[in-house]
Amino acid sequence: MVLDVAFRLFLEKGYEHTSIQDIINQLGGLSKGAIYHHFKSKEDILVAVMERMTVESNQMLAAIRDRSDLSGKEKLKTIFRESISRLVQDDIFTVAPDFQNNPKLLFGLLHDTIDNAAPNYILPIIRQGISDGSIQTDYPEQLAELILLVANVWMNPMIFDSSEDESYRKFMVFRQMMQGFGLDIVDSKMMERLIELTSIYQKSRQ
């Protein structure tokens, strides 16, 4: 219940403009002590909210990874398309957390990227792509990490507070980099969606 209320308030007011007291006021008499028994700070609440979203994201990644009708390259393209198109992304960018001032959140993203998403979802797909001939690399582990670090961190406007123009330029570099690996897996529709999410974030930060 705490996470549901917190997430709703984060959406309505933005993370930076929501206080612990705001959350308590919506919990029907639950005391501040009860909140702090489970969460030491507002940042801890945000981390828990994002972790719940990560579970849903992992389910999507697993479903694509386990499909038998796609090549490795096709699976990577599907993952990027589905990840950026999910409506929950609008919610995340509306909450507009400041990653630079919330180190636990940033560490959690890096930890999930390197220790979970890359080895458990992207790496098996790259290995499949090597086997079926759709992906060429001698360094599958490093490529899996590189793809996600660039997509989840470097291209993330919530981390570097990128403008729409900066997001466009980063996307084009990412696109060229992927093409250099023979991975033509991102297209103009994905670019338009990234610009849209950047705009949502910038408006939420105002």
Map each language-model feature to its residues.
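C-terminal peripheral helix-coil segments that are non-catalytic and often amphipathic
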Residues: 127, 131-132, 163-206
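Short secondary-structure transition hinges
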Residues: 88-134
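A short secondary-structure junction motif
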Residues: 30, 56, 86-94, 129, ...
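Hydrophobic alpha-helical connector segments
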Residues: 48, 62-95, 144-147
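Short hydrophobic clusters on alpha-helical segments that form packing/core surfaces
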Residues: 2, 6-10
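Hydrophobic alpha-helical bundle segments that form small-molecule/ligand-binding pockets
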Residues: 61, 117-147, 151, 155-162
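Helix-turn-helix
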Residues: 9-44, 48
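An amphipathic alpha-helix adjacent to DNA-recognition modules
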Residues: 3-4, 16-17, 38-62, 77-81
